[in-house]
């Protein structure tokens, strides 16, 4: 959740909407709540501690996630729960690391960075809890499309955003 920064920016830009942020880490939820209060958007924004693989209690028009699915213990289940939480014409906006399918396609400075983060944080975080251990280079577009199809999504569209580091997808139930 990065302490609520994305949701706070959205609430400032689109004040007629309601926003809910979720994170498994309680102290991050507390900090995000304080940040929303300081930004003057606490009446539009709430933050809750939740492991999304346990499901959502509400349905949403838009769900976003930023650089987190590859870290999850069970990314497939998380995607299933996200799909179930969207209204029929809703949208899941997913930002992930711009990794490629083949090892040699990830070679170079960015690949070095991706694999370093994977080994030192992303994979170990997931594997320590019995997860899949995808890591930053473990969720290329082909695998994401496979996971989304399994989760019940009908459409995955890669948005045309030029960024060597990240990729953004518009995903529909």
Regions found by a protein language model. Name each.
Residues 39-52:
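Conserved SAM-binding strand-loop segment of SAM-dependent methyltransferases
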Residues 61-76:
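A short SAM/SAH-binding and catalytic strip from SAM-dependent methyltransferases
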Residues 18-23:
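Conserved SAM-binding motif I beta-strand of class I
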Residues 50-63:
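A short acidic, Gly/Pro-enriched loop at the edge of an enzyme's catalytic core
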Residues 95-151, 157:
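C-terminal alpha-helical "lid/dimerization" subdomain adjacent to the S-adenosyl-L-methionine
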Residues 25-27:
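Conserved SAM/SAH-binding beta-strand->alpha-helix loop
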Residues 32-33:
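Conserved SAM-binding loop
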Residues 76-88:
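A short glycine-rich, Lys/Arg-flanked "PGG" loop and its adjoining helix->strand segment in the class I
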């Amino acid at each position: 959740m990065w302490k609520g920064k994305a949701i706070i920016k959205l609430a400032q830009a689109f004040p007629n909407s309601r926003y809910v942020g979720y994170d498994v880490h309680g102290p991050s939820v507390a900090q995000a709540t304080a940040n929303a209060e300081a930004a003057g958007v606490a009446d539009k924004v709430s933050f809750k501690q939740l492991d999304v693989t346990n499901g959502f209690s509400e349905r949403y028009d838009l769900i976003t996630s930023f650089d987190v699915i590859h870290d999850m213990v069970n990314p497939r289940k998380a995607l299933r729960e996200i799909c179930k939480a969207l209204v029929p014409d809703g949208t899941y906006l997913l930002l992930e690391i711009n990794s490629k399918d083949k090892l040699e396609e990830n070679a170079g400075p960015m690949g070095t960075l991706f694999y370093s983060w994977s080994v030192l944080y992303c994979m170990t975080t997931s594997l320590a809890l019995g997860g899949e251990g995808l890591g930053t280079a473990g969720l290329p577009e082909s695998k994401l499309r496979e996971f989304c199809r399994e989760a019940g999504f009908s459409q995955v569209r890669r948005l045309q955003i030029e960024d060597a580091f990240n990729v953004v997808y518009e995903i529909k139930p």
